[in-house]
Amino acid sequence: ANLVPADIKGVSNVLKALTKGEATGILPDQFPPEISGQTSTFFNVRTRTMTLIHKLIGRVKCNTLIASAIRVVDGWEIYFQRVDDDINSTDISASLNALNRSIEDIVKLNPSQYQWEYKRFKDLKDNGKKFYD
């Protein structure tokens, strides 16, 4: 594995790898900075979603899978699933909604093991209070 930083140089390395037909992995459910995300639906809640994957697919036209590792008594169960076909849409909203639906499908396999500390809803406010207060 070749880990790269989550900055412009890292994105450049990912793009180069994809253009060479190499496999890459991105954690798609991180809460992105405002400049790197757009509002989309995640578990029926409107929240910010990273746009990087949509942009990479638009440039490279690569295949996409979603993966997860679920801890079991004697190790791990690894799952690979197809991503909703709309992830390939040129419409960014359709693509991001497809990404989030695919993440939801993986989370539903075992919600207790999802990394909820990613705080996907931290930009939400309810009656002036932040979602995680």
Annotate each language-model stretch with its function.
Residues 8-133:
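Non-catalytic C-terminal accessory region of glycerolipid acyltransferases
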Residues 1-8:
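Membrane-interfacial amphipathic helices and adjacent loop/beta segments
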